[in-house]
């Protein structure tokens, strides 16, 4: 009888304190913006075929996902109104109010391995002719697209051609500006009523890769190579002066660190406190050996690689930092049965704590603002996987996931626009 009484007393407490919903919820209203590259099937599934005759049939797409406290995910995938490439970065940009998503597309394919598709005939049109035709979407174009994330039809509100190879776009911490990295320039834009306006174009040394903006709003770390296939990818330090970006120096590896730069790197992320950057030693050319995570100390007057987490995965694709400042995660790049590395970055000895199962080729990865959820996008399986955060270092994979278009290549997170 006493046990039965205890049970009845306990049930209301659990129900009131942690009401379980039969769908994915978040502690506050948020929006996820996932982009998908139609080339992914050709690049991954048939890459060993030579000669290659796969024709590009799948349209690029994006998926908008609204999550909240009291409703199932509101999800819509739109095909054929943007172009985007899986060659490059797993993150793009969102306006600070969550109203607009921004994504780049480019014609860089790295090397022949990624360039075996037969494109539609209109791809033979010159860049100058493409710019004159404002309505056509070209797979091999250098463009930026702005998408309305709140309008239920999610129209493209603006698209512009760029005189460079725009691999990556990120929002500045000031919540107003956006920075775009090309091979030869940084571009600075401001967004007004869904349209981009260029503020500056900054000449920089040539390089192929990605970047991250320091939370101080005054510096940038990029990870770039002169030739992604044959020359090592190195981290670089930049300074933002007004709207211009100025190259400062290469970020050297301290002699005490047992690691080095390798070819085919390029992915990195700066911690929210601005003290460190996690840098992928190698993303691609899988099946060789395990790649390291290089750790840059950004508190130094001249930032330097001062630490390393050895042999994390056969290619490291993306990073996310938990709001607690103790835990970070890194996605590995196995194509089918994949891995998520959970990292302890709080101690003097950064390390891998454990691995969790992840869908193939994981790209974009983001924690929810409160840190109770982790979202991970998979191009191979067309889904956003969800992990629940239990404590400082404990993640568990949720059996529920969010369905998106095939070929996921980037994930952005922000507030729900009101």
Question: In which residue ranges do the predicted regions lie?
Answer:
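Sec-dependent N-terminal signal peptides
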Residues: 3-12
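Sec/Tat signal peptide C-region and signal peptidase I cleavage site
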Residues: 13-17
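Predominantly soluble domains enriched in secretory-pathway, periplasmic, or organellar proteins
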Residues: 18-418
């Amino acid at each position: 009888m006493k046990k039965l009484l205890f049970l009845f007393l306990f049930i209301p407490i659990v129900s009131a304190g942690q009401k379980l919903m039969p769908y994915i919820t978040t502690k506050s209203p948020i929006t996820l913006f996932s982009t998908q590259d139609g080339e992914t099937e050709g690049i991954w599934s048939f890459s060993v075929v030579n000669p290659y005759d796969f024709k590009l049939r799948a349209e690029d797409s994006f998926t908008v996902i609204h999550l909240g406290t009291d409703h199932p995910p509101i999800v819509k995938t739109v095909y054929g109104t943007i172009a985007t490439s899986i060659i490059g970065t797993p993150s793009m940009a969102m306006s600070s109010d969550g109203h607009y998503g921004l994504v780049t597309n480019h014609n860089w394919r790295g090397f022949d391995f990624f360039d075996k598709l037969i494109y539609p005939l209109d791809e033979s049109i010159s860049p100058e002719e493409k710019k004159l035709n404002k309505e056509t979407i070209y797979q091999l174009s250098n463009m930026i697209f702005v998408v309305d994330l709140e309008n239920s039809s999610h129209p493209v509100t603006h698209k512009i051609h760029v005189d460079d190879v725009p691999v990556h776009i990120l929002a500045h911490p000031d919540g107003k500006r956006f920075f775009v990295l090309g091979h030869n320039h940084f571009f600075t834009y401001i967004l007004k009523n869904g349209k981009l306006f260029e503020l500056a174009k900054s000449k920089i040394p040539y390089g192929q890769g990605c970047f991250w903006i320091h939370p101080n709003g005054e510096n940038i770390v990029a990870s770039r190579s002169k030739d992604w296939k044959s020359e090592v990818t190195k981290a670089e330090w930049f300074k933002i002066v007004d709207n211009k970006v100025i190259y400062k120096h290469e970020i050297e590896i301290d002699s005490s660190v047992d690691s080095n730069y390798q070819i085919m790197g390029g992915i990195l992320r700066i911690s929210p406190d601005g003290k460190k950057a996690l840098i992928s030693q190698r993303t691609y050319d899988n099946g060789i050996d395990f790649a390291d995570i290089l750790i840059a100390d950004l508190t130094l007057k001249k930032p330097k690689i001062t630490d390393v987490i050895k042999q994390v995965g056969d290619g490291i694709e993306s990073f996310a930092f938990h709001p607690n400042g103790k835990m970070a995660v890194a996605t590995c790049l196995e194509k089918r049965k994949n891995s998520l590395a959970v990292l302890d970055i709080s101690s003097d000895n950064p390390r891998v704590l454990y691995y969790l199962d992840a869908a193939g080729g994981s790209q974009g990865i983001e924690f929810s603002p409160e840190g109770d959820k982790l979202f991970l996008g998979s191009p191979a399986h067309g889904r956003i996987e969800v992990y629940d955060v239990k404590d400082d270092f404990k993640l568990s994979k949720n059996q529920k996931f969010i369905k998106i278009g095939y070929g996921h290549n980037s994930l952005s997170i922000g507030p729900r626009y009101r």
